[in-house]
Amino acid sequence: MANNWLNNRKRRPTHPGEVLREDVLPAAGLTQDKLAKLLGVSRRTVSEILHERRPVTTDMAHRLARAFGTSPEMWLGLQQDVDLWDTHHARRKEYEKIKRVPAPKAA
């Protein structure tokens, strides 16, 4: 089943904001204000990401990757896992009603 990891996982994947808040910023000695200036975005944008109220977009992933020597894919991968989890759990019953299309028969 394609969604097996979503069904078997006991908790929501870690939001990239939590990674920034708990690991990256303390290690770098950065505050929200300093990070906002470094990234060229508003403090509100940074705060909303750190408090998991805003997703990491492709633009923000590039900014974070540049600032911390990582890749945009790393940040987007974290966000994608959260997005898939949230959507799956919010709409699981709806998705269960969708019938699978049978595989084509071999010629």
Language-model regions, residue ranges each:
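Intrinsically disordered, low-complexity and often Lys/Arg-enriched segments
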Residues: M1-N8, P102-A107
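A short, Lys/Arg-rich alpha-helix, primarily the initiator
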Residues: W5-L30, G77
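Hydrophobic side chains within well-formed alpha-helices
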Residues: P16, S71-P72
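The alpha-helix within a helix-turn-helix
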Residues: L25, A36, A65
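Short alpha-helical DNA-recognition segment
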Residues: L30-E48
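The DNA-recognition helices of helix-turn-helix-type DNA-binding domains
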Residues: S42, R53, F68, Q79-V82
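Short, basic-rich loop-to-helix N-cap that marks the start of a DNA-contacting helix
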Residues: R53-R66
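Short, charged recognition helix plus adjacent turn
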Residues: L76-A107
